[in-house]
């Protein structure tokens, strides 16, 4: 029999082993679609971003005008920009759902895969932050000022660090040019780490909703899951295109239609919606360094999750108490997101503080406690 080029060619066999003949559990649900959706989001963002970069000028006097020019005069420039801006939102929606799936089904027990995933999340957050500064509107400028200024809370080296990051004594032209350079570079870093993420995943194979070994019942990725991923893709593209074409500015801030002005501070400085939960945690602590540490902890806490798993069962499928706690955490994150968008006044301050306390309590204390309790209940 003639050798199959798909299995013998040095490059094609890597593709084959990752996307075609990959042995996959037969019972993974639609919650396992988000990995491929994230890959599509990344490719879309890189392509639209590349096209936008061709018309963008990283200079404080021209940045705002160059973005306006792209939308007005470049063929389909408005569409490319709207796809890129809203693509970021969908990227975050997918990554939050992907992480939620990992938490619910105990996927974090594949520690290397989980840790590279957390690094991917941090890199994505950095990319989105520097990207938001590029249009050089009011919220771009003041967002950059507020967030970079947080580094000054680091004892001893803080102020030096901030001025080094700014390239001067305030957010100005050097800041914009380096942010553009970083925004261009980081997506390719994300692509590289994604390959590492997949390499670690394929060492163990996918988890499944039952959390038990699926070695006895595997099916090839293609055609079963390739077709399922295409379905997931079409289902994501419908709301994505609806948003980008009918209300492209729905998730944006009106302040960003005003060019950056260092002399006028917007009444409410707030980041894009996908950072609001972390922003609310930052603001809930009335101390600069404490807030910065809480902000960092809100994401880095994910690295501790594998060590806090106390249950004898991997997934939450048959653990109603943990399920209740999980959905409580989801509701809590929605409350934090809402609080992050509100002004710093009563009653929002206390609500934010309670929600922040709940967030850390649920993850660090209640999940391990409930896991241990469920083990005891199983023994009766």
Swiss-Prot record:
Family: Belongs to the cytochrome b family.
Protein source organism: Alectoris chukar
Protein name, entry field: Cytochrome b
Cofactor note: Binds 2 heme b groups non-covalently.
Annotated GO MF terms: metal ion binding; ubiquinol-cytochrome-c reductase activity
Classification via InterPro entries: Cyt_b/b6_C (IPR005798), Cyt_b/b6_C_sf (IPR036150), Cyt_b/b6_N (IPR005797), Cytb/b6-like_sf (IPR027387), Cytochrome_b (IPR030689), Cytochrome_b_C_euk/bac (IPR048260), Cytochrome_b_N_euk/bac (IPR048259), Di-haem_cyt_TM (IPR016174)
Membrane topology type: Multi-pass membrane protein
Gene3D superfamilies the record matches: Cytochrome Bc1 Complex, Chain C (1.20.810.10)
GO terms under biological process: mitochondrial electron transport, ubiquinol to cytochrome c
Sequence intervals crossing the membrane: 34-54, 78-99, 114-134, 179-199, 227-247, 289-309, 321-341, 348-368
Quaternary assembly: The cytochrome bc1 complex contains 11 subunits: 3 respiratory subunits (MT-CYB, CYC1 and UQCRFS1), 2 core proteins (UQCRC1 and UQCRC2) and 6 low-molecular weight proteins (UQCRH/QCR6, UQCRB/QCR7, UQCRQ/QCR8, UQCR10/QCR9, UQCR11/QCR10 and a cleavage product of UQCRFS1). This cytochrome bc1 complex then forms a dimer.
GO cellular component, one term: respiratory chain complex III
Binding site for a ubiquinone: 202
Keyword set includes DNA repair: no
Residues that coordinate or bind heme b b562: 84, 183
Misc. remarks from the entry: Heme 1 (or BL or b562) is low-potential and absorbs at about 562 nm, and heme 2 (or BH or b566) is high-potential and absorbs at about 566 nm.
PANTHER family: CYTOCHROME B
Predominant location category: mitochondrion
Places the protein is found: Mitochondrion inner membrane
Function: Component of the ubiquinol-cytochrome c reductase complex (complex III or cytochrome b-c1 complex) that is part of the mitochondrial respiratory chain. The b-c1 complex mediates electron transfer from ubiquinol to cytochrome c. Contributes to the generation of a proton gradient across the mitochondrial membrane that is then used for ATP synthesis.
Positions annotated to bind heme b b566: 98, 197
This protein's UniProt keywords: Electron transport, Heme, Iron, Membrane, Metal-binding, Mitochondrion, Mitochondrion inner membrane, Respiratory chain, Transmembrane, Transmembrane helix, Transport, Ubiquinone
Cofactor names: heme b
